[in-house]
Amino acid sequence: MEVQAVLGMILLFHPERCSKKPGEKVRKSEFQKEVLKKVYQATPYPTWENKIDIGILISLSPRAVDIWFQNKRHINKGKNQGVDEAVESRTIDLQTIMSIVESTLRY
């Protein structure tokens, strides 16, 4: 519950963090890419709610996070021919996402 409150406060005080102009390409910082890679290792199929939370924490729109995961899965599909991955979304809790972000900040 506390973590949800923190996310709400971040979004409330910085609504521009998740906004961009339509059609504008989102350039990701090294920090953002590192967080996305670590979350991908935890689950290559995060739920939409997870994507919203990740987006708030690293200043990307949920759609930009979604596209990044789609592209990463597509790239890995070519590398992992014959490896069968489950297609369903896997929820990871917000605490896990927060600890990934915190560990990346220290990195």
UniProtKB/Swiss-Prot annotation:
InterPro entries: HD, Homeobox_DNA-bind_prot, Homeodomain-like_sf. One of its GO terms (cellular component) is nucleus. One of its GO terms (biological process) is regulation of transcription by RNA polymerase II. Transmembrane segments: none annotated. The gene is HD-7. One of its GO terms (molecular function) is RNA polymerase II cis-regulatory region sequence-specific DNA binding. It is found in: Nucleus. Coiled coil: none annotated. Residues 21-80 bind DNA. The keyword Chloroplast does not apply. SUPFAM superfamilies: Homeodomain-like. The keyword Membrane does not apply. Keywords: DNA-binding, Homeobox, Nucleus. It holds the Pfam family Homeodomain. Disulfide bonds: none annotated. This is Homeobox protein HD-7.
